[in-house]
């Protein structure tokens, strides 16, 4: 009877707790994907555009600062 009680305890208490813990992690992972834009359908390539600062004078192919 003791062996049957241990087996029932494992399958009726411990096993469901382990599976519930795994299911609880899934929404957090989905939220992390949305925050980090890991979804390939919504991913947009962002290329930074260099901005010129201050007064510059063009010399050939180079913009050099004045002063």
Curated annotation (Swiss-Prot):
Signal peptide from the UniProt entry: 1-24
Keywords, in A-Z order: Amidation, Cleavage on pair of basic residues, Disulfide bond, Neurotoxin, Secreted, Signal, Toxin
Subcellular location: Secreted
Propeptide: 25-50
Isoleucine amide carried by residues: 66
Domain notes per entry: The cysteine framework is C-C.
Protein name, entry field: Conopeptide Vt3.1
